[in-house]
Amino acid sequence: MTLILGIDPGSRITGYGVVRQTARGCEYVASGCIRTGSGELHERLQIVFRGVSEIIAQHGPVTMGIERVFMARNADSALKLGQARGAAIVAAAEAGLEIAEYSATQVKQAVAGTGGANKEQVMMMVMHLLKLTQKPQIDASDALAIALCHAHTRSSLVPHGLATARRRGGRLRL
């Protein structure tokens, strides 16, 4: 049994999802959003860091999956997203978690079976796979999808040895 944290980073809303990976699949543990409000960027990043740290302390995951930054049309938005990712990654690294990064396409492929799935399709598959009766918030749904992607990827890597994945700066590059 392994607890996995998924993070969908954002400078205003960071989604999180925790799943328990067992021999029979994944089970829902918790999900939600860290809302940072509209303060100064450094204050919002501190809220992300503290929020992720609290989730780790509360649930005790041993590994974390996080979405990679995509190139946005607005460079300022991409920079802020990258900084929010950094705050979440530092919180996980401080807690000693194994950290892996996934592109949005990888997450969609792992959960919905196609890298071109829309958010609604991903949410419906998350609900189906985790047997949820209510729709989670969209950012929480994305984070649960990242956790499921990480669980699936870990399962396929373990028989081959995690050594097949490249390590850079303490993070798995898959």
From Swiss-Prot:
A cellular-component GO term for this protein: Holliday junction resolvase complex
Binding site for Mg(2+) 2: E67
Enzyme Commission code(s) on record: 3.1.21.10
Biological process according to GO: DNA recombination; DNA repair
Cofactor, free-text remark: Binds 2 Mg(2+) ion per subunit.
Keyword DNA damage: yes
Keywords, alphabetical: Cytoplasm, DNA damage, DNA recombination, DNA repair, DNA-binding, Endonuclease, Hydrolase, Magnesium, Metal-binding, Nuclease
Main location: cytoplasm
NCBIfam families: ruvC
Entry function: The RuvA-RuvB-RuvC complex processes Holliday junction (HJ) DNA during genetic recombination and DNA repair. Endonuclease that resolves HJ intermediates. Cleaves cruciform DNA by making single-stranded nicks across the HJ at symmetrical positions within the homologous arms, yielding a 5'-phosphate and a 3'-hydroxyl group; requires a central core of homology in the junction. The consensus cleavage sequence is 5'-(A/T)TT(C/G)-3'. Cleavage occurs on the 3'-side of the TT dinucleotide at the point of strand exchange.
The protein's name in its UniProt record: Crossover junction endodeoxyribonuclease RuvC
Gene for this chain: ruvC
